[in-house]
Amino acid sequence: MILKKYKPTTPSLRGLVQIDRSLLWKGDPVKKLTVGMIESAGRNNTGRITVYHRGGGHKTKYRYIDFKRSNYNIPGIVERLEYDPNRTCFIALIKDNENNFSYILAPHDLKVGDTVITGNDIDIRIGNTLPLRNIPIGTMIHNIELNPGKGGKIVRSAGSSAQLISKDENGFCMLKLPSGEYRLFPNNSLATIGILSNIDNKNIKIGKAGRSRWMGRRPIVRGVAMNPVDHPHGGGEGKTSGGRPSVTPWSWPTKGQPTRSKRKYNKLIVQRAKKKI
């Protein structure tokens, strides 16, 4: 996709960078594949705020995505590419030879009229889904199953992909994930070939606070601007620095310090992601 930049004729256009979505479908989604969404605005069942900075925004409909891709050896044709407000990558509407429709995550370079299929012995082509044991080493993949048959759970955001590194004789394949982590997966887990679409999503600049509100994001208040009852950094006479290392409202260290329990162990993780400097 192409990035759109604007002349600064208004303050909100200065620095605005958007994705050109002119090639995507401009109509409504397939009605049978959508359902209305009830916004929680960050509240739980008792009405208390459990997730801050949520609320408002445009109404959206959830699109049912086929993460399992379990219809083996049934080819489908890409009818159109669509925008999905609930995720960063684009989605593709697939029509099979029995006139059944489904949505899948659209890989980069997938075009209208292309054919996609799920199977064991099929071509290594963008959009096709295979077990890891049948995918060549070095291939870039996405929508990977953690447990066979449960549907793709990881590597599903815009521009992301994992790389198949090796295969062993114990029924596992090693993948390098987008975070830099090396992890083992069962070799019969399904994965889809290619890098996900909307690669330039990371270069978007929203331009103004109002656009954040359209997306359902509310303002973030600094802890030092609160009262002591609301935040560990709150209170004090006049402006203060907080007086302690940065923490969350629940006193967990922030600013990059690991908070995961050292006692937790996962034998499938070969090497954890390295710290970013």
UniProtKB/Swiss-Prot annotation:
GO CC annotations on file: mitochondrial large ribosomal subunit
Gene3D superfamilies: 2.30.30.30, Nucleic acid-binding proteins (2.40.50.140), Ribosomal protein L2, domain 3 (4.10.950.10)
GO molecular function: RNA binding; structural constituent of ribosome; transferase activity
Ribosomal protein in keyword set: yes
Polar residues: compositionally biased ranges: 248-259
Compartments it resides in: Mitochondrion
Region annotation Disordered: where it falls in the sequence: 225-263
One GO-annotated biological process of the protein: mitochondrial translation
Entry keyword set: Mitochondrion, Ribonucleoprotein, Ribosomal protein
Main localization (coarse): mitochondrion
Family annotation (SMART domains): Ribosomal_L2, Ribosomal_L2_C
Stated family: Belongs to the universal ribosomal protein uL2 family.
Name under which the protein is recorded: Large ribosomal subunit protein uL2m
